């Protein structure tokens, strides 16, 4: 598979929409796989709309270099081109070791820059030159200008750029805007207008951007990584129930694929008061439970089922929004209590300061996620805050990050474990046996 990476000098440059538009435009001629640098759950949804295929996260912090290369190779099989969307600015991250730049270097992928040119002209030449020559061990091949006001504006920008090929531009258009919410861009599930937005943006890209040159610039250099054979179980698979609806939609595609090797996956919707009676394991991911408090409070059958399964010792794993749902009460911005499942004696305020960043967790107690004394990396991404925690058993000591309380995460009751950290199951320290 050929591959190219789209990056920028900062967040807010239009990467997600332009990347999705390019994916959609190229999909008319090629089989395109989307990838996303970093831990983001939302942008891959846009990629899926654009290509028709799930987008795959590539995160050096959580996955490590070899697993990133394996995922790129594995999910690139049978595709003509992989398009990787970067995160933040090209050199941003915990440090450059976990940046988009490092991802491009590790995966031997050439870079095309997307630069927001609103309110600048010739200065774009200095921005592009700075990005290109700040490091010399990656290949910045092209640049696309965003928010170009006129042909004259485009010419000023184009004439200022040296040593990098200008591939075209996207004109300023007030209709080209993805709305934001407190955790970033609105999710695809929330906004059905996203499909029309990507379609419109792709029409502009087809008109103003050299798509053939993008495909030509993409690299097919060998990743020099061995792909292990799929270790899918040959026996009868146990059933795993996975919460999935607009309140719980934050799942990595690769995590689901890893679980499919061992389990028959059946999805259920807490918002619709559903449950899976014969489940032998349960997984509740993150999302936006704070936007669906009334419906979740009324999901009495789901909550009763989860509580009974927890008491019976069934393995339940929950992340972030899942932790909130398994708690006792969620308190909204008007200080109104909403009763949740109550497996954990924890009350959580649903809207507080944003907590976002990578985590590093040490397993200090035996559990079914990580062997004791092992260390695993994840990330936190929420605006909620526990205000009452009457639980004593936690399986993780937080070495980097915040966790639930007092640098502890992974609250445990029976065989139920819930944490604020999201984990990527490709990490070799994890034992996803459920």
From Swiss-Prot:
Q: Which reaction does it catalyse?
A: cob(II)yrinate + 2 L-glutamine + 2 ATP + 2 H2O = cob(II)yrinate a,c diamide + 2 L-glutamate + 2 ADP + 2 phosphate + 2 H(+)
GO MF term (any one): ATP binding
Pfam families per record:
CbiA, GATase_3
Domain spans labelled GATase cobBQ-type = 239-430
Co-factor requirement: Mg(2+)
Q: Where is the site labelled Increases nucleophilicity of active site Cys?
A: 422
Please name the SUPFAM superfamilies in this protein's record: Class I glutamine amidotransferase-like (SSF52317), P-loop containing nucleoside triphosphate hydrolases (SSF52540)
Known pathway: Cofactor biosynthesis; adenosylcobalamin biosynthesis; cob(II)yrinate a,c-diamide from sirohydrochlorin (anaerobic route): step 10/10
The record describes the protein's role as:
Catalyzes the ATP-dependent amidation of the two carboxylate groups at positions a and c of cobyrinate, using either L-glutamine or ammonia as the nitrogen source.
Note from the entry: The a and c carboxylates of cobyrinate are activated for nucleophilic attack via formation of a phosphorylated intermediate by ATP. CbiA catalyzes first the amidation of the c-carboxylate, and then that of the a-carboxylate.
| Protein name as annotated | Cobyrinate a,c-diamide synthase
Gene that produces this protein: cbiA
């Amino acid at each position: 598979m050929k591959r190219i990476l789209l990056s920028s000098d900062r967040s807010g440059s239009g990467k997600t929409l332009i990347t999705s538009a390019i994916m959609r435009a190229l999909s008319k001629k090629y089989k395109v796989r989307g990838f996303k640098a970093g831990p983001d759950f939302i942008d891959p949804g846009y990629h899926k709309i654009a290509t028709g295929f799930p987008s795959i996260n590539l995160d050096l912090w959580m996955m490590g270099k070899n697993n990133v290369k394996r995922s790129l190779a594995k999910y690139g099989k049978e595709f003509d081109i992989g398009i990787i969307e970067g995160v933040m600015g090209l050199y941003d991250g915990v440090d450059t070791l976990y940046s988009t730049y490092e991802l491009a270097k590790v995966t031997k992928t050439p870079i095309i820059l997307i630069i927001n040119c609103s309110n600048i002209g010739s200065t774009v030449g200095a921005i592009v030159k700075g990005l290109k020559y700040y490091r010399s061990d990656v290949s910045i091949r092209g640049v696309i200008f965003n928010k170009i006001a006129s042909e004259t504006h485009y010419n000023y920008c184009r004439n200022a750029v040296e040593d990098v090929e200008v591939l075209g531009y996207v004109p300023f258009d007030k209709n080209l805007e993805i709305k934001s919410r407190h955790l970033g861009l609105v999710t695809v599930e929330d906004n059905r207008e996203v499909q029309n937005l990507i379609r419109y943006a792709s029409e502009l890209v087809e008109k103003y951007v050299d798509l053939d040159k993008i495909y030509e610039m993409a690299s097919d250099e060998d990743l020099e990584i061995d792909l292990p054979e799929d270790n899918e179980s040959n026996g009868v698979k146990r059933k795993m129930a996975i919460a999935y609806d607009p309140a719980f939609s934050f799942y990595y595609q690769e995590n689901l694929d890893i679980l499919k090797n061992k389990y028959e996956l059946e999805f259920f919707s807490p918002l619709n008061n559903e449950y899976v009676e014969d489940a032998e394991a349960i997984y509740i991911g993150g999302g936006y439970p704070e936007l669906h408090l009334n419906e979740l409070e009324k999901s009495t059958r789901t909550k009763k089922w989860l509580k009974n399964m927890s008491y019976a010792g069934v393995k339940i794993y929950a992340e972030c929004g899942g932790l909130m749902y398994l708690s006792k009460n969620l308190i909204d911005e008007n200080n109104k209590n909403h009763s949740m499942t109550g497996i954990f004696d924890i009350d959580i305020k649903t809207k507080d300061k944003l907590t976002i960043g990578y985590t590093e967790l040490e397993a200090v107690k035996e559990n079914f996620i990580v062997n004791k004394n092992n260390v695993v990396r994840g990330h936190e991404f929420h605006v909620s805050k526990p205000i009452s925690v009457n639980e004593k058993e936690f399986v993780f000591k937080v070495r980097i990050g915040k966790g639930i309380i007092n640098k502890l995460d992974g609250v445990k009751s029976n065989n139920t474990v819930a944490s604020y950290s999201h984990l990527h199951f490709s990490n070799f320290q994890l034992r996803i046996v459920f």
